[in-house]
Amino acid sequence: MPVKNYSEKAYKDKLESIFKRFPSVQKVPFGDAYKPGLEHMESFARLLGDPHLRYRTIHIAGTNGKGSVANMLASVLSAVGLKVGLYTSPHIIDFRERARILLPPASIYPDRARSAVENPATGQAPTSIYPDRARSAARRDLSPSPEELPSESVCCSLVPQEYVYDFLCRYEKDMDDLDLSFFEITTGLAFKWFADENVDVAVIETGLGGRLDSTNIITPDLSIITSIALDHCALLGNTLEAIASEKAGIFKKGVPALVGEYLAETRPVFEAKASQTGSSLTFAQDVELSMEERFESILREMDLRGEYQAKNLRTVLSAVDILKRTPLYSGLSDQPTVEDAIIHTASRAGFHGRWEALRKDPLVIADLGHNPAALKENFSQLERMMSTGEYSSLIIVYAVMADKDLDGILPLMPTDATYVLTGLESTRALPPEDLARRFKEYREGAGKPCKMVVTSSAAEAVKTALSLDDGRNPLIFIGGSTYLLSEASSFFVSRGF
């Protein structure tokens, strides 16, 4: 049935209105946008008819890696015949990236899915917000090109604009009355869409923390924590133990729990919480996987090319081993299907922003890692790539939010690189002149070269980085902030890269 008064302009205007009126981390500090506690979300869910009770769920928290694990797991579950909802945040270009549905392959499960080229909500071709990008499967640091992908590789649909518009119009007064945050609104939207589309299971990623996160009204079949590192300390605590405790708040009574990576400080926290909830607890880094002999092969072939994905892959395969013990997930025993689905996660799930090649010549790689733990992995991989002698120079486009641990990041940044430091549209971003000052102070104090260019916008920064191409095969990296990745990706998409 057509949505009353819907048009693309009406959709964009309504979304912008909601975004401006309700607090979100994109435009205000986390402390102002984050509403700890579940009361508002529980009330909103009741008003929506408790949609999250109409399907099974898997809950994922963690400082780093939860988006990758969520997308890999959703890809696998859909490949074995389940209709899978996937809720992640933030989005990179299109708001609707936050809520996706992955369909089973139609040729294998004709009674479970429509054609992989059809949107289950609209009957139209699935939405793609990114044009085809030149990629090479021969390189470990690049993703495969579209022509190298299986014909049914694209099986993901974004929540339709019409649905978003109707939802925001229908429940706008309730959103005001309940004094919701933007994240609570998007969580309710995703939960209801999944119910309306009759998904079998939804993979739900927390927004921030776990215990008091809006998504924590669900009782999942499996609770997963990917990793713990220092981030959002003002809200979650200043120690690894405190942050682990907040994340472990997603453990539920009698629900199995899986931890991807633990540290000496965090393992006792997880063990204590699992004991309280009566949850069987598995540490992925300690177990022998049923697909252990295929691990390295899968890692080499994955279209998620960051070397840090090794940890996430082990977490996903551990989750598969736990879930396949129950009837709903028995299809996960099909190892070839599981392997293929993981290998093609980025293409099947429409997943972007993780060691993604935005351009081939010169090679431009982008990653949304933004805290010291994530950036250490990024910078280490860049240095290994440079050590091969294949690239003439390293150019890094960098921006940072004002609340991030810049003092912890500066020592990790590659020494021999040219830096293009920039500002962002977000009011949370550290102004470029402040970033440049602190960068220079650290470099001079450490006796390191201080090759930098300062720009005011992401678009200007990308143009500057490309202008530094010496024609001898430079390597360009864009990172430090999700918002930088969003603005840079928009730049490349608008120019057809």
Predicted regions and their residues:
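Acidic, Mg2+-coordinating active-site environments of NTP-dependent enzymes
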Residues: 110, 115, 120, 144-146, ...
